Amino acid sequence: MFWKKDPTVSWERKNINDIDFSRFNVAIIGGTGGLGRAISRELAQRNARVTVVGQTFRDEDLKDKINFVKADLSLVSECKRISHSDEIPYEELTHLIFTTGIFASRQRQATSEGLEKDMAVSYLSRYIIFHDVAKRLGISRTKKDDLPKVFIAGFPGNGQVGDPDDLNSDEKKYSAYATHMNTVAANESLVIDAKDRYTNIDTFGLNPGLIKTNIRNNLLGSDTYLSRITEWIISWTCQSAETYAKTICTLIASPAIESRSGTMFSNKGDAILPSPGLTKDVVEKFMENSELLVEKALRNQSPFTSSNE
C-alpha cells in the first residue's frame, strides 16, 4: 500500500471484549455483504443496535439483532428513498458507515438512470444518502457528549485524484481502472469536503486495502476461475473481513478520534495522510459535478423503475 502515516493522530487499541457497544446505534449502508456484513455481525453480536441496507439479507442467525432494509443502491431514486426512509433511525444514530462498492466492469455498464454502474454504486449512493441525512444525523440521541460519526470506506490516501469532469465515464475512452479510481478519488473528496461542511458530525475515511470479498465479481466474473484464484491469493496474503471488522469496531469506539474529522485510516487502523493532489479546487469540482450527475439521473429516471427492484 502506498499511503503515509499521519503522526498527529493516534488511538488506544483496547481489547474489543472490554468495550461496551450497547450504547451504539449504527446504520451500515451496504451492510449485507463483504466488509459491511462483517462489521454489522461484529457489532450485532456485541449488543449494538444495527440497521443494514442492501439487496439480500444473509444473516438469519442474527435477524433478531439486525434490522434489514432492502434497497437497490445503484439507483439514485432508491438512494433518495432510503435517505428519507423511516426504517432507518438517522436522528438516533451514533454511527453511519458506508461500505457499498463494486469494481467497474471491463465493458462500461449503465444503470436504468443512465449512470455508469460502479460510480452509481461505489460513490453516488454514498454522496446522496450522506448529504441528505448529515444535518439531522443523531439529533435525537439520548446521550450527546460526543458527535455522531460517519465512516466512508474506499481507498483514500493513495494519491488518486481522478477526473471530476468525467464522473460518468462517458467523455473519454472507457477504462475500468480509470473509472474505479474516479470513485476512489470521489469518496476521499467526500470525506475532505465534509470536514468543513458538516461541523455537527465527525467524518472519516477508511482504507481496508485488499480483503477477500465479492467486490471484484463485477470485474472478474462471479465464481469464475480467475475470480477464484484471485480471491484465494488475497485470502492467503491479506487479512480477512472478520479481522478487519474487529479493528474497525474498536476504532469507531475510540474517544481519541473525537473532533478529528477528515482523518483517514489504513487497513490496520493507523491514521494516514490524505492524497496531496485532492486540493480544495479539485474537491469542490467533485462535489459540484456529483450534484449535476444526480440531477441528470433523476431526469433520466425510467417510469418503470420500481423501489422494489
UniProtKB/Swiss-Prot annotation:
Gene Ontology molecular function, alphabetical: aldehyde dehydrogenase (NAD+) activity
Family to which this protein belongs: Belongs to the NmrA-type oxidoreductase family.
UniProt-listed SUPFAM superfamilies: NAD(P)-binding Rossmann-fold domains
UniProt keywords, alphabetically: Membrane, Oxidoreductase, Transmembrane, Transmembrane helix
Membrane-topology annotation of the record: Single-pass membrane protein
Protein name: Uncharacterized oxidoreductase YKL107W
Gene Ontology cellular component list: endoplasmic reticulum; membrane
Coiled coil: none
Keyword Oxidoreductase applies: yes
Subcellular location per the Swiss-Prot or TrEMBL entry: Membrane
Domain of life of the native organism: Eukaryota
Transmembrane segments: 23-39
EC number(s) recorded for this UniProt protein: 1.-.-.-
GO biological process, one term: response to furfural
